[in-house]
Swiss-Prot record:
Cross-referenced InterPro entries: PEP_COase (IPR021135), PEP_COase_bac/pln-type (IPR022805), PEP_COase_Lys_AS (IPR018129), PEPCASE_His_AS (IPR033129), Pyrv/PenolPyrv_kinase-like_dom (IPR015813)
Protein name per Swiss-Prot or TrEMBL: Phosphoenolpyruvate carboxylase
GO cellular component: a single term: cytosol
Assigned keywords, A-Z: Carbon dioxide fixation, Lyase, Magnesium
Organism: Azoarcus sp. (strain BH72)
Reaction equations catalysed: oxaloacetate + phosphate = phosphoenolpyruvate + hydrogencarbonate
Length: 917
């Protein structure tokens, strides 16, 4: 009999649910517990048995709740969503370990599979494979967004619960130990219940920085070095000559938090400098803690083990001259390193670390000097027969120092091209009266900008007071220059231009960088990457042409030499989706990448794509492994950056082991895609033409609803939680770029998040059904067969449909209809919702026909089971949220308890959906 692999997951969910129920009974009373349990059982009965009587009973019960009961129900089911996520993550870890323990073949997405595939199937020499990483860069980039609803305090509680579940899994506990573990779990669930889920005040940028840093403390600082070590060991196992080979720092975690100014007036030069200091503190604290522990471990006596001359000299320079450690050169050397790093801490941050050094010492001039001292320790251990000791904590510390430096994570700077344009126009008007920059056409603007880039003379005068906008932008770039001098050039690598639509947008940024000394024309030096961000459908279509013209400018090609002939380009998934819909956005991105590959190849420039993906499929989300493998040939080549946004950061990196697995997936997918034999399986012309036809039809359908239907904006604002999201203290950035209700002005993130909350997920599928219907009508004989072949043979199309499959499985039209009832105009409500319902049915029918499934997610039974297990806990939250929205709006939003309940429900639904923003 085949064992039920999901039984432990169900046991964990039952255990956590029981502990939460006990907590509710103890804290709120038996009546509250009985009510919540009745709602849960009714919801389970409806979902499990498709019992329509149970659905009516559920709706009647929820509609009859008092205000106080409503809040308790919302809290209980929201916390349960979080607990279910913890149990699910633990089950992923459990299954991965079981797979390894069974000696099974490596799974797709693992380092073992990727390396084995390269060596065995592609016949790559291990030395050549190691060389691949010499020029590679793989970087997930953390961003703060208006949908990140997790509080750090909640994350801390969840970490404790996850650790205790893991303990139950891995250890053979005695009865007393098992009882102690259960008591600890009970306390942790109680703490979670009594921890406020919402913030009392709106999040500041510094709060967001703190939130982001928690993932470095729990996951990245420890797991990245282990991943590097595992990869090096695997290469050494394949080629003994690589036994001592150390890979360069090709895998790094970046951040936008503290540097993303696009639409966020609260990101200033002062905030950037504070964010950099906070990051440095986390990195240095970690190094100091590791050195302290290393000093206690390396108690090696010179009478028993040798030491190199360099190590002895390092020990002699140490301020630790205690006679008790006179024969322990490794300990004394470590004490000296600690003292110098402690002085560095004080030098960079203005105060000493919590644990003082044995004595004063000179600070390190840069991180390379610290790395050199650690290398001296390493070489001495290896040369004197104690290489095993060099491969433990010291190995991980050396790797951490090389990856994280003194800056922890490079912070990207980002600003809208319109802002750069205004600043440059003002600077030119003062320096060159009559230049009339804004009145110039594109050619005139470029000529003026290239004139400025040909001279070292700055535009800005210290004797002129410019507008606040201009002063603020110049201050940011000057702060970036200071950061390079203080923390090293790794602190800020990239300056990103949002809404890039022409060549002048890139040259404007170049001129502003020159003002701060980050671009120095006479030296042909450029200290940061100038990164265009192409976001709308039109901009994506023009991207290759813009880059072609840029590379034709001699002065820019000279500057690229300072960046190793590598040019980064960012592609925006979110805005292109809001602009043209899911299908057209995906296709426009795919085509843009292929065109960029051709242009970059022709100019001999290395392309690095930065994918601005969100958590939801409507914003480019979905499994990273499949997404990377589905890239066009030549679009990766060892170079890839991608954003990690919203609640996805917590889901991917909140648990260290899950975080390690997600980092592995990025490396594995990048390796496999980069080493794929380019051009061997060119996409058939018929596939491309069909995709274009589908895209055109889907675009017309999507734009027809969202931008051309009278009253659609009213429908959206009244039938979703968009108004309430704007008031939720979950991000420092406003939900809209401008005041008003225009869809054009709304940020893509709350747009998608709002549709997810009401269980329509419209940005992740709308338009596909109509497009396929039109295609089949025009090709009645062979149309479906061709689409099925595209699904089987073209990874891009298969990934697109796989993501849509997942999105559609989370939709619920019955629940969505409850939200539609919030629309005051019945004619508007019925007409728009009926269009959505009809398109949803056409889309589901089309998807099932093409994928040859009977039900959604038949091809992914694990995900199907996971999502279905969530519905009984999500459904009550959605029903209660609708009722709270009705009461809130009827009462003009004056009841703080109702407002609080809405915000908790938003949190719980986001947790239950996992990738909604």
């Amino acid at each position: 009999m085949t064992p039920d692999k999901d039984a432990p997951l169900r046991e964990d969910i039952r255990l956590l649910g029981r502990l939460l129920g006990d907590t509710v009974r103890d804290q709120q009373g038996a009546a509250s517990f009985d009510l919540i349990e009745r709602i849960r059982q009714t919801s389970v009965r409806f979902r499990r048995d498709e019992d329509l009587a149970a659905r009516r009973e559920l709706e009647d019960t929820l509609d009859a709740l008092s205000r106080e009961q409503t809040i308790q129900v919302v809290r209980a089911f929201s916390y349960f969503s979080h607990l279910a996520n913890i149990a699910e993550d633990q089950h992923h870890i459990r299954r991965s370990r079981a797979h390894l323990l069974a000696g099974s073949a490596p799974r797709e997405g693992s380092l073992a599979h990727a390396v084995g595939h390269a060596l065995d199937e592609q016949r790559l020499d291990p030395t050549d494979l190691a060389a691949f990483f010499d020029t590679a860069l793989i970087s997930p980039v953390l961003t703060a967004h208006p949908t990140e609803v997790q509080r750090k305090s909640i994350l801390n509680c969840q970490t404790v619960i996850a650790r205790l579940l893991d303990e139950r899994d891995r250890m053979q506990l005695t009865p007393d130990e098992a009882e102690a573990n259960l008591d600890a779990l009970r306390r942790a669930v109680l703490t979670l219940w009594q921890t406020r889920m919402l913030r009392p005040a709106k999040l500041s940028v510094i709060d967001e920085v703190n939130n982001g840093l928690s993932y470095f403390e729990t996951t990245f600082l420890r797991e990245l070095p282990r991943l590097y070590a595992a990869l090096e060991d695997r290469l050494a196992g394949a080629q003994p000559a690589l036994a001592n080979h150390e890979l360069p720092a090709f895998l790094q975690v970046g951040s936008w938090i503290g540097g993303d100014r696009d639409g966020n007036p609260y990101v200033t030069a002062d905030v950037l400098e504070e964010a950099l200091a906070m990051q440095a503190r986390v990195a240095l604290d970690y190094y100091l803690d590791e050195l302290h522990t290393l000093g206690s471990q390396l108690s090696l006596s010179q009478g028993l083990v040798g030491a190199s001359d360099a190590l002895l000299a390092l020990a002699d320079r140490s301020p630790d001259q205690s006679p008790h450690r006179s024969d322990e050169p490794y300990r004394r050397a470590i004490a000296g390193i600690y003292a110098r790093l402690s002085a560095t801490y004080r030098n960079l941050l203005g105060h000493p670390p919590a644990r003082h050094a044995v004595a004063e010492a000179e600070p390190y001039a840069d991180v390379a000097a610290l790395a050199d001292d650690l290398d001296t320790l390493h070489r001495s251990l290896v040369a004197n027969g104690t290489a095993a000791l060099a491969r433990g904590r010291l190995r991980h510390l050396r790797r951490a120092v090389r990856v994280f430096g003194f800056h922890l994570a490079p912070i990207d700077l980002r600003q809208n091209s319109d802002v750069h344009e205004r600043v440059v126009a003002e600077l030119l008007e003062v320096a060159r009266p009559g230049a009339a920059y804004l009145a110039q056409d594109e050619a005139g603007r470029c000529a003026l900008l290239l004139d400025e880039l040909a001279t070292a003379r700055p535009l800005a005068s210290p004797h002129v007071r410019y507008s606040d906008d201009s002063e603020g932008e110049l201050a940011i770039f000057r702060a970036a220059r200071r950061a390079h001098l203080r923390y090293g050039r790794g602190a800020i690598h990239n300056c990103i231009i949002s809404k890039t639509d022409d060549l002048s947008d890139l040259l404007e940024l170049a001129v502003l960088l020159k003002e701060a000394g980050l671009l120095r024309p006479l030296e042909k030096a450029l200290d940061v990457n100038i990164v265009p961000l192409f976001e709308t459908i039109g901009d994506l279509e023009n991207a290759a042409g813009v880059m072609d013209r840029l590379f034709s400018i001699p002065v820019y090609r000279e500057l690229l030499a300072a960046r190793d002939q590598t040019q980064e380009v960012m592609l925006g998934y979110s805005d292109s989706n809001k602009d043209g819909g899911f299908l057209t956005s995906g296709w426009a991105l795919y085509k843009a990448e292929g065109e960029l590959v051709e242009v970059f190849g022709r100019h001999g420039v290395r392309l690095r794509l930065f994918h601005g993906r969100g958590g939801s499929v409507g914003r480019g989300g979905g499994p990273s492994y499949q997404a990377i493998l589905a890239q066009p040939d030549g679009a990766v080549q060892g170079q890839i950056r991608l954003t990690e946004q919203g609640e996805v950061i917590a889901a991917k990196y909140g648990n260290p082991e899950v975080g390690r697995r997600n980092l592995e997936v990025l490396v594995a997918a990048t390796l496999e895609t980069s080493l794929r034999r380019d051009g061997g399986d060119a996409t058939p012309r018929t596939f491309l033409d069909t995709m274009q036809a589908l895209s055109d039809a889907a675009f017309t359908c999507y734009r027809g609803l969202v931008y051309e239907t009278p009253g659609f904006e009213q429908y959206f604002w009244e039938s979703t939680v968009i108004s309430e999201i704007a008031g939720l203290n979950i991000g420092s950035r406003p939900a809209s770029r401008k005041k008003g209700t225009r869809i054009d002005d709304l940020r893509a993130i709350p747009w998608v998040f709002s549709w997810s909350q009401c269980r329509l997920m419209l940005p992740g599928w709308f338009g596909f059904g109509s497009a396929v219907k039109q295609w089949l009508a025009a090709h009645p004989k062979d149309g479906l067969g061709l689409l099925q072949r595209m699904y089987r043979e073209w990874s891009f199309f298969a990934t697109l449909l796989s993501n849509m499959d997942m999105v559609l499985s989370k939709t619920d039209l019955a629940i969505a209809s409850r939200y539609a009832e919030l629309v005051k105009d019945p004619v508007l409500r019925d007409s728009i919702f009926e269009r959505i319902r009809s398109e949803w049915k056409d889309t589901v029918d089309a998807l099932l026909a093409i994928t040859e499934q009977v039900e959604l997610l038949d091809a992914n039974p694990l995900l199907k089971r996971s999502i279905r297990n969530r519905f009984p806990y999500l459904d009550p939250l959605n029903h209660v949220q609708v009722e709270l929205l009705r009461r809130h709006r009827e009462g003009n939003g004056e009841d703080a308890r109702i407002r609080n309940g809405i915000h908790i429900s938003i949190n719980g639904i986001a947790a239950g959906l996992r990738n909604s923003g």
